[in-house]
Amino acid sequence: MQLNPAEISELIKSRIEGLAASSDIRNQGTVVSVTDGIVRVHGLSDVMQGEMLEFPAAADGQPSFGLALNLERDSVGAVILGEYEHISEGDTVKCTGRILEVPVGPELIGRVVNALGQPIDGKGPINAKMTDVIEKVAPGVIARQSVDQPLQTGLKSIDSMVPIGRGQRELIIGDRQTGKTAVAIDAIINQKGQGVTCIYVAIGQKASSIKNVVRALEQAGAMEYTIVVAASASESAAMQYVSAYSGCTMGEYFRDRGEDALIVYDDLSKQAVAYRQVSLLLRRPPGREAFPGDVFYLHSRLLERAARVNADYVEAFTKGEVKGKTGSLTALPVIETQAGDVSAFVPTNVISITDGQIFLETSLFNAGIRPAINAGISVSRVGGAAQTKLIKGLSGGIRTDLAQYRELAAFAQFASDLDEATRKQLDRGARVTELLKQPQYSPLSTALMGATLFTVNKGFLDDVDVKKVLAFEAGLHQYLKTSHGALLDRLQQNRAFDKEGKDEAELTQAITAFKKSFV
């Protein structure tokens, strides 16, 4: 059989065209040293800051990943996310070309996940349809809208004196064992039926404490709208550092789609300590209190992502799918102080970043005033605009009464005979202080809170014994629920008294009637 030259050339051409000679270009390097979860890698010339690096798989076949944090002249300093015992000198490290991402979306609601969004509650896999990067730029000034919608915590002392609005950052600060977590959990429980998705980020806490929080949320039915991100004390410093950003990204998913979300960081002191540990192991120069120079930026870039975004931003983000809706992410960061020292490095940083703070005091807590809020130095810089008309109108006198009471109580210790006006002021203050006490996991509705504040404002409690004030309040709430349900429904819906004064008259009548029967 003889082939002519044209056929031969056609055959060669077709063979060449069918040849798959593709090559996969990947940037890779070699492990130089491994110490305390910090890996030095030689090579990786094109690596990005914060890029995920792929390390050899562990014995169970799960791939190991790290985060490139230090980009030096001849090596890269990376921190391992998870176990690092199986990594040794000479191992190959590959660039992934991706920044660290976590799963986001409604599939995460009701689940407990780790800092990487992997389930740790034993309820099976999370089939999230989307992932998103943990480090994002916060919305700009043009994309934002002013805070004017309330985020009710259900706590009398907070909603009346330091109100929180949707999209605000309100710091909860105090010594250990002063009820900081309790305030945050009550705020989450009170969002039931309010259309707010909650994210609770536990950083550096004991696993048993996190378990107790999850149990409390389950019992209150709050896990139906809550995601728990847990980086316990037993996990690496890198996981504790990353967890806050992971939780924030999960919250931003809802914010950017015109929904409301609430995120609690419990607590950022431990996150700062974890970041300090990572930074010192990476040989970064230490500054004040041995924290690295960018510890302010650590918290500012996180908390600036909590915002209320306008309808244009939401419409542009969703490509026109969601119109005319604003979204919000409200942040409640927690900071633990040492012996009440709010002028330490991390507390002052976070105070300057947030829109106000709720200061909890050990002395008040030990005196049985719980929540132990110090009304004098607790402020809300933007929440006043978001307060409901009902609570705003009734709470004006509360802070003044308390402030005057604290001042007079200090002098009254030394005075033997007090004039009538001073005694009245002291009596009113004692009753207000007693009335602001509230048991844990029992947030109040706006209507019942309004009724309570109305009672003290109009002087109905002036002749009730201080020890019976809380019993009076509980009895009044029960009486209003059974006999004046329609009034409570109106107040809850309108969040204000009617202009004709009928609601006010009915409430006065109801309290007077109840008081006659109260023994």
Curated annotation (Swiss-Prot):
Domain of life according to the entry: Bacteria
Record's catalysed reaction(s): ATP + H2O + 4 H(+)(in) = ADP + phosphate + 5 H(+)(out)
Subcellular localization: Cell inner membrane
Gene3D superfamilies, per the entry: 2.40.30.20, ATP synthase alpha/beta chain, C-terminal domain (1.20.150.20), P-loop containing nucleotide triphosphate hydrolases (3.40.50.300)
Record site: Required for activity: 378
Binding site for ATP: 174-181
Annotated keywords: ATP synthesis, ATP-binding, Cell inner membrane, Cell membrane, CF(1), Hydrogen ion transport, Ion transport, Membrane, Nucleotide-binding, Translocase, Transport
Major localisation: membrane
UniProt membrane topology term: Peripheral membrane protein
InterPro entries xref list: ATP_synth_asu-like_sf (IPR023366), ATP_synth_asu_C (IPR000793), ATP_synth_asu_C_sf (IPR038376), ATP_synth_F1_a_nt-bd_dom (IPR033732), ATP_synth_F1_asu (IPR005294), ATPase_a/bsu_AS (IPR020003), ATPase_F1/V1/A1_a/bsu_N (IPR004100), ATPase_F1/V1/A1_a/bsu_N_sf (IPR036121)
Entry GO terms, CC: plasma membrane; proton-transporting ATP synthase complex
Any one Gene Ontology molecular-function term assigned to this protein's record: ATP binding
Keyword Membrane among UniProt keywords: yes
Similarity comment text for this entry: Belongs to the ATPase alpha/beta chains family.
Function: Produces ATP from ADP in the presence of a proton gradient across the membrane. The alpha chain is a regulatory subunit.
Binding partners and assembly: F-type ATPases have 2 components, CF(1) - the catalytic core - and CF(0) - the membrane proton channel. CF(1) has five subunits: alpha(3), beta(3), gamma(1), delta(1), epsilon(1). CF(0) has three main subunits: a(1), b(2) and c(9-12). The alpha and beta chains form an alternating ring which encloses part of the gamma chain. CF(1) is attached to CF(0) by a central stalk formed by the gamma and epsilon chains, while a peripheral stalk is formed by the delta and b chains.
Name of the protein in its database record: ATP synthase subunit alpha
Top-level taxonomy: Bacteria, Pseudomonadati, Pseudomonadota, Betaproteobacteria, Burkholderiales
